[in-house]
C-alpha cells in the first residue's frame, strides 16, 4: 500500500478502528481547508483538533493540526507574520527562532509534526510571495512534499496563488477535480457548523 505509513497499514489489519495515537505529520498536511471556513480562531482550532483526532490523536499530532489551521486562519484575517509567529510560539511552544538557512544543514527526513510543522511555518514566515514560500519549503529537504503542502496552505491564505500558477496546476488535474476546486472556492465563505 504505497503512500501509507506503517502504523496506518497495521491499523487497517486490526479489529478495532480506534485512532492509533499517531504523532505523524499527516494531520497537519491535510488540515489546511479547516483554516478557511470558520469565523473564530477558537472554532478553527476545535475543528482542526477533530480532524486530527480521527487518526492522529497523539498530542503532537493534534498540536500540529491546530497550529497549521491557526496560521491559515490568522493569515486570512490579515494578521502580520510577526503576530502569527508570536501566537504560534506562545500557544504551541514551537521554536521558530532558527532561519531556514540555519535549519537546512541539519534537517533530515522527519514524519513527525514536531519535526515538520515548525519548519513549514518558518518557510512561510521567510517567504516573500507564494512561489518563494514554496521554493523555500522545498529547499529544506526532508519530507519536502509535506513541508510544501503545509507551507503552501499558509502562503495561499496570506498571498493568494498567482493566476499563472493556478492555470499551470489546472493542466495537471482532471475535470472532476476542477469542479471540486471551484466548489471549494465558492464555499470559502465563513461557516459555522
Protein language model regions, located:
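Structured, active/binding-site neighborhoods that engage oxygen-rich ligands
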Residues: 1-193
Amino acid at each position: 500500500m504505497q503512500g501509507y505509513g506503517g502504523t496506518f497499514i497495521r491499523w487497517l489489519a486490526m479489529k478495532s478502528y480506534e485512532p492509533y495515537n499517531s504523532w505523524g505529520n499527516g494531520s497537519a498536511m491535510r488540515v489546511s481547508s479547516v483554516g478557511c471556513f470558520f469565523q473564530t480562531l477558537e472554532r478553527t482550532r476545535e475543528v482542526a483538533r477533530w480532524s486530527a483526532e480521527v487518526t492522529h490523536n497523539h498530542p503532537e499530532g493534534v498540536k500540529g493540526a491546530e497550529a497549521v489551521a491557526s496560521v491559515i486562519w490568522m493569515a486570512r484575517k490579515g494578521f502580520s507574520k510577526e503576530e502569527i509567529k508570536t501566537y504560534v510560539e506562545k500557544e504551541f511552544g514551537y521554536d521558530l527562532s532558527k532561519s531556514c538557512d540555519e535549519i537546512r544543514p541539519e534537517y533530515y527526513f522527519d514524519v513527525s509534526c514536531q519535526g515538520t510543522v515548525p519548519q513549514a511555518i518558518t518557510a512561510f514566515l521567510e517567504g516573500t510571495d507564494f512561489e518563494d514560500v514554496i521554493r523555500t519549503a522545498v529547499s529544506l529537504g526532508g519530507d519536502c512534499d509535506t513541508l510544501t503542502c503545509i507551507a503552501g496552505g499558509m502562503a495561499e491564505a496570506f498571498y493568494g496563488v498567482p493566476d499563472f500558477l493556478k492555470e499551470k496546476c489546472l493542466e495537471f488535474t482532471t475535470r472532476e477535480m476542477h469542479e471540486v476546486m471551484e466548489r471549494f472556492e465558492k464555499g470559502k465563505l465563513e461557516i459555522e457548523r
